Amino acid sequence: MTEIIQRKLNDSAFVRWTALILIALTMFFGYMFVDMMSPLQSMIEAQRGWTPDVFGMYGSSEFIFNVFGFLILAGIILDKMGIRFTGVLSASLMFIGASIKYYGVSDAFIGSGIETWLNSWWVSFPGSAKLASLGFMIFGCGMEMAGITVSKTIAKWFEGKEMALAMGLEMAIARVGVFAVFTISPWLANMAPATVVRPVAFCTLLLLIGLLTYVVFTFMDRKLDKQLGLDA
């Protein structure tokens, strides 16, 4: 009796490392967006009237929803819905939040009805900072959800293989985004005419690319699930 052994998708080193790169890019772009504004504090204070206190409150807004238990909810969603749904959801939240933040600091926001309304309450906190903080909150939810999703994804694709190496490499790729943005963000902002909007727009576009790379990964993961006999 001859036993036929089916080679699974993640048995191929090339395929599983390609999958890792696709999901790592999502995190790479996410980490770029997290720290994109850090080297631009003085510029946004000058161009949008923020104070150091306002900038500090904006920076902390990324974690507000997560402090109040969103990460627990994210874990429940991941267990119930799986890595494909949760990964696309998290990348979408990152892009949506980034888009809101982009609008908040853009020239189009200045003089708009939304700015007038946002400036009518909590007047010490500019409307642009309020909207940028809201976007950063939503982005932060997606970012932290993506973090646990990527960990579960690597555990699935690298089970019995180079799991620890894959986790370390994914984190290394993601953290390079922090290093890169401290060079890229000021360079983009200082191009004539100098503006904080340009690096925000650039990193928002990268998050859209990160969403698309994760969508590409979902097709690979669906094929792996079929090979494993799991529900597609």
PLM regions: where:
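C-terminal ends and interior cores of transmembrane alpha-helices
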Residues: 92-124
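Small-residue-rich segments within alpha-helical transmembrane domains of MFS-like 12-TM solute carriers
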Residues: 31, 35, 124, 128, ...
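Helix-loop-helix hairpin linking two adjacent transmembrane segments in secondary transporters
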Residues: 170-222
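Central cavity-lining transmembrane alpha-helices of secondary-active solute carriers
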Residues: 60-76
